[in-house]
């Protein structure tokens, strides 16, 4: 396993949301997102100085809501040996999407829609000179366009259900290692056409989490799709699973990295903001720019966290708490919920060429 050293400050430096460590009422640590919030709020945030006034009333562990910089935040606190850890997450009710962002998403949906309409019209025309090969090409482009639209709609629907609280958590004991192996196997079966190699490395035996199969599966596909796009033709994508333990805390760490050139810090700064999105992370992006937003919500829903780092290449890390599987009944095996549609082609439709969408015999 690569040593990414994601524990401690290294993890929180990469966290896209404000994190502050307080010790005896003073600021002991803060990350870049906390510094940006302090600047917007007009606070003074420096190490070894008193906490900003709005945060001084926070005491003990738990969850509460705060109004900071004119926005509603969910504040989660945890008592550590080094002090009180304060993690801030913008409340979904405070997230507003500007009209220009909606226009951008509509434009991205218009591309596959236009392609779908165009090839459908060509197929509807009676052309005695059209070869069987050309007809098959049109049908493949038609299928790719439809799958791309379906993927976009699935992303919006899932993100909406997680943001407004109308979907209760229904986790079951699930073998994350088995789920990752299944998804990677399916991805490998179509990645030759994409010109990218994908591999999975596991270390640590059984990796049981209390999870929702469909959401974790959707998160995996989004992260792999991002990595394939970043790696480019002839690139390499690697997933690593590792069981971790620190005192009484047990968790599984999933790290995904690619052979691409990485991202600029200013690109990552907006990657988790629904109002801006990650569409600008790649010139080849054909999605809505909401994939990382969705993945982060899924990780947090499962009691975990997600971070994206960049250097020589992009690295995405997800940590999820482990369970023993005994307190939750029978082990839940990964299931196919695609309803007859090739789920892998849907989830990777924005990075696979049209040749991958030929009708299976």
Task: Locate predicted features.
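Short conserved segment of the HATPase_c
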Residues: 263-276
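Short alpha-helical segment of the dimerization/phosphotransfer core of two-component systems
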Residues: 144-152
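Sensory modules in modular signal-transduction proteins
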Residues: 1-35, 103-105
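Conserved micro-motifs of the catalytic ATP-binding
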Residues: 164-169, 208-211
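Glycine-rich phosphate-binding loop
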Residues: 284-294
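Conserved catalytic submotifs in the C-terminal HATPase_c
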Residues: 170-173, 197-207, 244
